[in-house]
């Protein structure tokens, strides 16, 4: 599921795999392998993609069906 979400987010944002790979400072083929599920995506990349797409890491990982980012909580 996570791999499909990576592709869906990219396509929904009218981006090419090359665009996302450049944002993550990695080779295109490495990113392609993440989308195909051939290679496990590192935590740092999931965090960066969540920020980039304004969504949650849980959504990217398939742990949530809501693409909305988590609400920030105020500390006293």
Name what the model sees in each region.
Residues 1-12:
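A short, Lys/Arg-rich alpha-helix, primarily the initiator
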Residues 5, 16, 42-45, 56:
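Residues that mark the N-terminal boundary/hinge immediately upstream of a DNA-recognition element
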Residues 11, 22, 51:
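Alpha-helical residues within the helix-turn-helix
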Residues 14-33:
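Short alpha-helical DNA-recognition segment
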Residues 25, 44-59:
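DNA major-groove recognition helix of helix-turn-helix/homeodomain DNA-binding modules
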Residues 61-76:
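Short, charged recognition helix plus adjacent turn
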């Amino acid at each position: 599921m996570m791999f499909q979400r990576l592709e869906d987010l990219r396509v929904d944002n009218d981006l090419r795999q090359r665009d996302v790979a450049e944002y993550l400072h990695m080779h295109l083929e490495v990113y392609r392998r993440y989308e195909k599920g051939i290679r496990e995506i590192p935590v740092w990349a999931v965090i960066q993609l969540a920020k980039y797409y304004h969504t949650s890491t849980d959504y990217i990982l398939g742990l949530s069906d809501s693409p909305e980012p988590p609400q920030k909580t105020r500390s006293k």
